[in-house]
Amino acid sequence: MKSVLVALATATAVSAHGWVDNITISGQFYQVPLHSLDHENLPYQDPYMGEWAPKRISRKIITNGPVEDVTSIDLQCGGSTIEGQIGSEPAPLHAKAVAGSEVSLRWTHWPDSHMGPVLTYMARCPDSGCDKFLPGDEPIWFKIHHEGRHTFDKTWPDDIWATVSIAQHHITSILSFLTLEQTPFMKFDNEPYRYTIPECLKPGFYLVRHEIIALHSAWAAKGAQFYPSCHQLEVSGSGSVVPSASNAELVGFPGAYDAEDPSILFQVWAPGPYNIPGPAVFECPAQ
């Protein structure tokens, strides 16, 4: 019965993946992209065209579907090489933010079945800004936050991941009696995901890479699904640290993950611990 319900939920959710709809930084609200009451209006279909298109702090994504190849440059920010958007096209604006402050990202719906970790990375851009910066696969990214499996000592229906329960109502009705528990964020009351900009960072321009890794099909090779997106910050503050190979674990995208990594090739429906992929979370040096 459980496998039938999971299959139903997964099939129904194929066209119902979520994305970051808006970001709040230093009290300023940023639409990512423009909100629309038209449910067919996916994030890559901004209704404003030409000279009327509003400028963004977020880099464009081509589709609300996943990146499934860990060796693809599209893993970086959700671009689509096939569509001519390598990695992801830089945004024209930067959001002003203070080191040590909290940033809130509000997702749209998210399928209950698509359980997995949520991770956030940063990379320092050139002194001229991020608006023309394409990192390639250089190891410049440092992880600032991650969440994975919150519990693993319960039976499957009570399993708690960082992505459970932002599902649409029709998915919820299928799974409701399985009592999938809600997580600290991504709830039906649309609690945002939050990360904190490291307080020690040297002022400058930074690219933030935020992602969900959905593991519902990850028992098979290339079954993991990656949902990355990027936004651009201009960080101020009194910090002086520039993360480098001497004080942080830096990775590239692609390059940070391996398809055979036990955290990528993983049976999410089985109980047991889960080690979040990628480097250790960067910590500011002790004062």
Swiss-Prot record:
Disulfide-linked positions: 77-230, 200-284
Pfam families in alphabetical order: AA9
Signal peptide (residue range): 1-16
Binding-site residues, O2: 216, 225
Substrates-to-products reaction catalysed: [(1->4)-beta-D-glucosyl]n+m + reduced acceptor + O2 = 4-dehydro-beta-D-glucosyl-[(1->4)-beta-D-glucosyl]n-1 + [(1->4)-beta-D-glucosyl]m + acceptor + H2O
Alphabetically ordered keywords of this record: Carbohydrate metabolism, Cellulose degradation, Copper, Disulfide bond, Glycoprotein, Metal-binding, Monooxygenase, Oxidoreductase, Polysaccharide degradation, Secreted, Signal
CDD domains: LPMO_AA9
Keyword Glycoprotein annotated: yes
Entry GO CC: extracellular region
EC numbers on record: 1.14.99.56
Textual note on the cofactor: Binds 1 copper ion per subunit.
Subcellular location: Secreted
Cofactor requirement: Cu(2+)
One term of GO molecular function: metal ion binding
Residue positions with a glycan: 22
Top class in the EC scheme: oxidoreductase
Biotech and industrial use: Lignocellulose is the most abundant polymeric composite on Earth and is a recalcitrant but promising renewable substrate for industrial biotechnology applications. Together with cellobiose dehydrogenases (CDHs) an enzymatic system capable of oxidative cellulose cleavage is formed, which increases the efficiency of cellulases and put LPMOs at focus of biofuel research.
Primary location group: secreted
Family label: Belongs to the polysaccharide monooxygenase AA9 family.
Function: Lytic polysaccharide monooxygenase (LPMO) that depolymerizes crystalline and amorphous polysaccharides via the oxidation of scissile alpha- or beta-(1-4)-glycosidic bonds, yielding C1 or C4 oxidation products. Catalysis by LPMOs requires the reduction of the active-site copper from Cu(II) to Cu(I) by a reducing agent and H(2)O(2) or O(2) as a cosubstrate.
Protein name: AA9 family lytic polysaccharide monooxygenase C
Gene for this chain: LPMO9C
